[in-house]
């Protein structure tokens, strides 16, 4: 087992020392000298622990201690030693006769450190604060700016002008694209500056035929941007893009295939209504060809419903 702390013993006094206690320890040391500090309290008649007696003698009661303030030479020596070896107060105190390590440490923390900070010197590295800031900038990469020539006002203006020129060219290209697009004309002299968007339904339940139709129409409008159609294109029908399965096979198939066909037809009707609503709300009167295409889809839809009434009578829309 380890030795318990001496201050934990029973009936041991703690706190400030009195003049009577100081006189007892001084008298004992004057007669017997410094020896085993754990036995001195009992022999001197002190109700103190050995550690407390040793610290009291070393830091306050020794006859060679100096109790006056530190001189200028002592302060300079403390600063030089601290610059060389750091906070090794015992080693610094050995160079100062009559001073304890506790005295040196307290004087450094209360006086000398603040004095150096007021002089613009870092108390840890003993370097000027301005030099430390410069080194920090070099380490962090900010100091490279001092080795670079600052751009003149003319170069800044040139960069800003080039940026504005790029933005102007981009805007002009967009306007020319929407101007020449066949989907944007209402007549030969008026056009919209905002593009027309077909919004797809959130539930993608249709076949790939709708995407192929839209991709073919978009590729036509992109490859021929300068051609303005005078009449709507009606040389194709939306039924040409359906699946290539023959109609009798669909009619004679099982109930599962009939249900799939009717579901596709139902969702296609929803998609057509959704597209027509978007056309009416966002591009009313501005896309004649698109509206005619949707009208063609709706007409063919009604024609299919009239041709296959036996497939759609059992479902409510």
From Swiss-Prot:
**General function of this protein:** Required for anther development and early tapetal function during microspore maturation. Regulates callose dissolution required for microspores release from the tetrads.
DNA bind region: 37-61, 89-112
Q: Which domain of life is it from?
A: Eukaryota
GO MF terms on file?
DNA binding; DNA-binding transcription factor activity
Phenotype upon loss of function: Male-sterile mutant, defective in tapetal development, characterized by irregular and excessive division, redundant cells and leading to dysfunction of the tapetum. Impaired callose dissolution resulting in altered microspores release from the tetrads and no pollen production.
Cellular component GO terms, alphabetically? nucleus
Q: Name one GO biological process term.
A: anther wall tapetum development
- The name on file for this protein is Transcription factor MYB35
Q: Which Pfam families match?
A: Myb_DNA-binding
Respond yes or no to whether keyword Transcription is given for this record: yes
Taxonomy of the source species: Eukaryota, Viridiplantae, Streptophyta, Embryophyta, Tracheophyta
> Where expressed (tissue)?
Inflorescences-specific. Accumulates in anthers, especially in tapetum and meiocytes/microsporocytes and microspores during anther development.
InterPro entries per UniProt: Homeodomain-like_sf, Myb_dom, Myb_TF_plants, SANT/Myb
Gene3D superfamilies annotated for this entry? Answer: Homeodomain-like
Where do the HTH myb-type domain residues begin and end? 9-65, 66-116
Sorted alphabetically, the keyword list is:
Developmental protein, DNA-binding, Nucleus, Repeat, Transcription, Transcription regulation
Record localization: Nucleus
* Main localization (coarse): nucleus
């Amino acid at each position: 087992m380890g030795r318990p702390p001496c201050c934990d013993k029973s009936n041991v006094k703690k706190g400030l020392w009195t003049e009577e206690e100081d006189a007892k320890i001084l008298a004992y040391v004057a007669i017997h000298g410094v020896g085993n500090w754990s036995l001195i309290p009992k022999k001197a008649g002190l109700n103190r622990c050995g550690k407390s007696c040793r610290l009291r003698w070393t830091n306050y009661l020794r006859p060679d201690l100096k109790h006056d303030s530190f001189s200028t030479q002592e302060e300079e020596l403390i600063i030089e030693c601290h610059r060389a070896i750091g906070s090794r107060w015992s080693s610094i105190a050995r160079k100062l006769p009559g001073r304890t390590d506790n005295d040196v440490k307290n004087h450094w923390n209360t006086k000398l450190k603040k004095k150096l900070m007021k002089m613009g010197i870092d108390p840890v590295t003993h370097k000027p604060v301005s030099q430390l800031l410069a080194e920090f900038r070099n380490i962090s990469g900010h100091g490279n700016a001092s080795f670079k020539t600052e751009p003149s006002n003319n170069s800044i203006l040139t960069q800003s002008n080039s940026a504005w020129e790029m933005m102007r060219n981009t805007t002009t290209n967009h306007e020319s694209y929407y101007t020449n697009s066949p989907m944007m004309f209402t007549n030969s002299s008026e056009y919209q500056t905002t593009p027309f968007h077909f919004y797809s339904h959130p539930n993608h339940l249709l076949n790939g035929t709708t995407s192929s139709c839209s991709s073919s129409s978009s590729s036509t409008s992109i490859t021929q941007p300068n051609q303005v159609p005078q009449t709507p294109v009606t040389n194709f029908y939306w039924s040409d893009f359906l699946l290539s399965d023959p109609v009798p096979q669909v009619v004679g198939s099982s109930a599962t295939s009939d249900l799939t066909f009717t579901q596709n037809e139902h969702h296609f009707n929803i998609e057509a209504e959704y597209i027509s609503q978007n056309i009416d709300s966002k591009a009313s009167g501005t896309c004649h060809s698109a509206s005619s295409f949707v009208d063609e889809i709706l007409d063919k839809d009604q024609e299919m419903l009239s041709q296959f009434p036996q497939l759609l009578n059992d479902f409510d829309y």
